[in-house]
Amino acid sequence: EKKTVYVSVFNPAGPSVEELKGLYVESNGYVSIDAAKFHRKQEIGEIKFDIVDGLGFDNKVVRLGDPFAKTPYYDGLLLTSNYVAPVRGNKFPVLEYDFYSFQTGPVDVYTYMLPIFPLDNEHGSRYGVMVDNSPVYLPEAGAPYYSTLWIQSVLRNCRINKTTHFIDKPGKHTVKIYCGHPGMMLQKIVVDFGGLKKSYMGPESTRIN
């Protein structure tokens, strides 16, 4: 007896695989980004971006500045809220990750951070998340001691934060991660267009090599 199996395949005429090489590409409704494999970085003053081996789900994380470094000054930006206006200018320490999307509309960006305690009351645990020229969101890598969120983050060895952005057209885009309070550690970034499935460690990288 013959049976027919139907398989859904997405095979657009363009861009070619060659054109996508080196980019993180949307696959099954999401883009998964390896934090240690950024496309560009801009270091300012004392703020340097370091790859730290032996930590995180993939045994490698990016440290957003030395925790003892002076917190960067952002003109008109206070590191005390979850949202700020678009960052203008190029005087900020930032990591940039290029990705290619086939869809448009609202997207959720998940940043996977190592859970961390600030050094003291003068240090926080905020970092910036931006897509293209969107507003910047400032989630926290830390949580109040012994809170439910802190316990969950420690058990999972990861603090996962969600910010929502807007993709206006298909094509190449850029996720930007800003150093807010130095010392935060980034494991992974996932851009969800609606296809992300629930998992413990998040999806593997969708970079085309």
Please name every model-derived segment.
Residues E1-N209:
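Extracytoplasmic
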